[in-house]
Amino acid sequence: MNRKQALIAAVATAIVSFSALAEARELIQNKGSDTLVNVAQAWAEAYQKVDSDVAVAVSGGGSGTGIAALINGTVDLANASRAMKQKEIDLAKSKGQNPIEHTVGFDALAVYLHQDNPADSLSIAQLAEVYGEEGETENWSQIGLEVPGCKGQEMVLVSRQNNSGTYAYFRKAVLGKRRDYKMGTRDMHGSKDVVDLVEKTPCAIGYSGLAYATDHVKLACISKDGSGECVMPSVETASDGSYPIARPLLMYTNGEPTGKIKEYLDWILSDEGQCIILKKGYAPVRDVTCN
């Protein structure tokens, strides 16, 4: 065998060995909520050091997308920032699936304002009039505010696309089950997109997960009815439930998890996994001590 043939043989052997190693690793498919995608990626990366025989492939697309993938049997774990709807559960069961819900953390669904907005607090009722169909509040002056740089004081309503769990949860918690969003909202693909648009738009108001907050936007203090004290969104107020728009963060499996999927979920709920969700700006499912 000459030198060239030996080199080709060595490369071929390396490729075969790498392929065999990749095939030996168990792949866990994880898809869904844009709110959870960053922490899900952090979990997946950290878990490589825990179990090198497992690879976790993470993608976003929204809670509805992840749930649909679970129903169709194309993922092992569906991330969601809302609970599955009954019609989704029924569809899953009709396809032989048995979705099981797992709470992996909590989030404060924050209301974002431009830095120059003078608003100190907003009530759930005010938000409903801002975002809800037939809501009468369309400009900042109607709630006694004048926002610098906002031409005509007309509100720019920043929302999420309707396959988003954040969209669904805000509708349920703020507008109520029987009320839809008013026309004219700017529906963003991702959580970060909401915050970015609010930062650049003096007239804007938007909602997104607390983990996407930056120093360039303002967080509104939210009250349940306008008469009581408002509560700021934080890890603590999401955890203790005092923030009016706190929500659980969920993962769904098809049936009770077993094997490597169970081991991965158990690790997510361990102190190590919960410290990662805390560092990403979400509330853990219980008190944890982190380095």
Language-model region placement:
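Bacterial N-terminal signal peptides that target proteins for export
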Residues: 1-9
